[in-house]
Amino acid sequence: MVLTARQRDELNQAIHQYLLISYQQSAQVFKTEAVVKDGQIEADLLEKKWNSIVRLSKRVITLEQQVEQLNEQLAQAQAGKIQFNKSDDEQRLTPFEKFKLEGHRAGVNCVAFHPQYQILGSASDDGSIKLWDYESGHFEKTLKGHTSNVNCLAFDPTGKYICSASSDLSIKLWELKNHTCVKTLIGHEHSVSTVQFSDHGDFILSASRDKSIKLWEVQTGFCKKTFSEHQEWVRCAVFSNDEKQMASCSQDQMIYIWVIDSGQILHQLSGHEHVVEQVKYVPEHGAKQILTQQQQQNIQTINLLVSVSRDKEIKIWNTILGTNLFTLSGHDNWVNGVSFHPDGVHMLSVSDDKTIRVWNLKEQKQKKKIENAHDKFILKCEINKFIFATCSVDQTIKLWLLS
């Protein structure tokens, strides 16, 4: 491979920077012979590129092994040695444990995937945020700054920032490049439960035990709007797919659908018989398939919402009509979190019953159950393509492979 002039200059600058640390004379000779230009370059760039190459090499080896296995299965299928049936779909969706990440000293409340790099963030009751390489399972960095439990974290769409919510009443914005806190958002009067970035990264939505939801402007750090109608602790608030609306759920057992611009409540959804822990909008491509199955094909009704509750149930709502489409039952204890498979139709849920369950939303059925996925209550889960992450009161994070 031939490097471009720009790539060659950047490489020479990185080598020169590396030599300067311990080999000053060699660095001067190299600078002269390679005609290295003075310029701004990211610290430790050469080491970072080297580590990236090692990680990518491991990933290539893993993918080559998977391709080899799939080719063998394909050859067997073509030879008639494998008969596919309905159970294959169940097998395909079975999570297989890849890594158990240990390092937190208290329960882990939340996990989040970086939108571009192989970084997983975790938030814990020990007051810290940890960053992990989810391909290798290696610990990378601890972010410290909160003085109480860290309840939630989220990456912005560019991957430049990470936002954290804490019981110390604050929201912190961290710059990943330097692992430093660049803003602290103050305004909530009790624990901050969740945070979420808007799709363009301009705004942050937060929910709090002070019974309010706040919309923050990232650039200024100012609170643009406060929504206060819930009667109890707001457990979660999320933007709708088009970001014109939002959904919130609360300890008051209610789910509210809000129009963000006006601050008005569009619908009050009731039906759960205990605290509603989380709400999430179904991806649009999955919502369309579900609505087609439900014979509700109006293109305007693509904002489907999933809610999970301590009443052990998962409910799916049409937020345009304000109606409950169906309810999924099966968990034996509080349901704490859900995440969607890339196909948009399958969903995974986690619970205090220590199980992971896989659901088909079109069929409204449970397809798979993983018993004792953690030693204690499982609090949250997230999916990034075909990597599934869970976190638990047992102080660990687990990474699972999905096909």
Swiss-Prot record:
Keywords: Cell cycle, Cell division, Coiled coil, Cytoplasm, Cytoskeleton, Microtubule, Mitosis, Repeat, Transport, WD repeat
InterPro entries: Coatomer_complex_subunit, Dynein_regulator_LIS1, G-protein_beta_WD-40_rep, LIS1_N, LisH, WD40/YVTN_repeat-like_dom_sf, WD40_repeat_CS, WD40_repeat_dom_sf
Record CDD domains: WD40
WD repeat extents: 103-142, 145-184, 187-226, 229-270, 271-327, 330-369, 373-403
SMART domains assigned to the protein according to its UniProt record, in alphabetical order: WD40
GO cellular component, one term: microtubule
LisH domain boundaries: 7-38
Gene Ontology terms: biological process: cell division; establishment of mitotic spindle orientation; microtubule sliding
Location relative to the cell: Cytoplasm, Cytoskeleton; Cytoplasm, Cytoskeleton, Microtubule organizing center, Centrosome
Any one GO molecular-function label of the UniProt entry: dynein complex binding
Coiled-coil annotated residue ranges, if any: 51-87
The keyword Repeat is annotated on this UniProt entry: yes
Role according to the record: Positively regulates the activity of the minus-end directed microtubule motor protein dynein. May enhance dynein-mediated microtubule sliding by targeting dynein to the microtubule plus end. Required for several dynein- and microtubule-dependent processes.
Domain notes: Dimerization mediated by the LisH domain may be required to activate dynein.
Family the entry assigns: Belongs to the WD repeat LIS1/nudF family.
Name of this protein: Lissencephaly-1 homolog 2
Lineage: Eukaryota, Sar, Alveolata, Ciliophora, Intramacronucleata
